[in-house]
Amino acid sequence: MKRGKEKSSEGPLVSIVCTNYNKGTWIRDAIEGFLQQETDFPYEILIIDDSSSDNSPDIIKEFAENYPDKIRAFYNTKNLGITKTWIKVCKEANGKYIARCDGDDYWVDNEKLKKQVALLESSQGSLWCSTDFDIILPDGTKTHTSALENGIMVRATSYENLLATKGFTMASTWVVATNLMLEVNDAIDTGAIDDTFNIQLELFYRTKLTYLPEATTVYRVGHESDSHPADTIKAKQRNDRLLETQLEYIDKYRDKVDFVELSKQSMTASTNLEAMLLDERSNLLQANITIRQQQELLDELDSRIKEIQDSKRYKLAGAMAYPMAYLKRVKGRFR
C-alpha cells in the first residue's frame, strides 16, 4: 500500500481535480465552490476540458486568467472520454491528496477539504475519504438532502459490498492520497464505461474508506452524462458493461475476495430489490384502481351532462313549439 506524497512546505497539500465535457451550464458553480474553500493549507485547482463543443473552455479560461496562482487549465484537442481524461490530468497533480469534483457537481461546504484532510491525516489505515451529498435536477431543484444518510442511494462500504450492490461513494466528494490514486489509475481499464466504478473497486481493494456523514456536495442528475445515459439503449449497454466489470473483478482479486461476505451482500441486495419491485407493483396496482375509479366518475359525469343537455333540448323544443305558453311559465317563476 502506498502513502501519499510527503507534505511540502512550499507546494499544495491538496490538488482539486475537475474534469469537464460540455458542462458549460454548470461548470461555473463547480469552480466557485473550489475557490470558496477555507483551509489552513495551500491547495491548487486543476481543470481539464475534454474538447467540449459548448462554452465550457471559455469559462474555464476566464477563471484561469483571473486566478493564475490557483488554477491550472488543460484542454484536450480531441475528445478522449472520461477515463483517459481523468488519468491524464491526475499526473499533473502536485498535492499529497487529490480531491475530485466533476464539472456538473459542486461543493456547498466551505470547509469540505479541511474536514476530510484532517480525517485522513489522523487515520492509520485509510487513504480515501468520501462524504454524503444532496441531489438536484439540472434546473437546480433539490430533490433529496443527505442522500446516503436518508437511504436514497446505497452507500458502498467495502469491496464485496460494492461488487454486490453497485453502491455509491460519490466521486465528487472524494479526497484520495495522490500516490494511491496514480497507482489505481494504472490498474483500471481506460475503456471503462464508468471510470468511477472501476476506481472504487481498486480503492476498496487497497485501502479503507473513511466516511464523513455530512452533505458537502451537490450531485446533479437528470441530464445526459456518462453515468446517466438518456437513451434507453445506451443505459442498457452501460448496465451490461457494469455487469462485465463486476464479473471481471470477482476473478481479478479472487485471492482477496471474501466470498461468504460477497454472497451475503448479494442476497441482501437481491432481497432489497425484490422489496422495491413489490412496492412498485403495489403502487401500480393502486394507481390502476384509482384510474378506474376516476374513469367511472368521469363516465357518470358524462352521463349526467348528457341528461342535462337532453333536458335543455326538450325545453328549448317546447319553447319553440309553444312560445307563449313557455313565456308565461317562465314569467310566473319571477312573480
Please give the residue ranges for each predicted region.
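Conserved donor NDP-sugar-binding/catalytic core segment of glycosyltransferases
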Residues: 111-144
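Boundary detector for helix-to-coil junctions that initiate low-complexity/charged tails
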Residues: 255-335
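Short, acidic, metal-binding catalytic loop of nucleotide-sugar glycosyltransferases
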Residues: 32-42
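Conserved nucleotide-sugar donor-binding catalytic segment
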Residues: 131, 150-242
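Cell-envelope/extracellular polymer assembly enzymes that use nucleotide-activated donors
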Residues: 12-15, 44, 198
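A conserved acidic beta->alpha catalytic loop
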Residues: 49-58, 78, 102
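Glycine-rich, basic loop-to-helix element that forms the pyrophosphate-binding segment
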Residues: 76-93, 115
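Short aromatic/hydrophobic "clamp" motif used to bind/position activated sugar donors
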Residues: 98
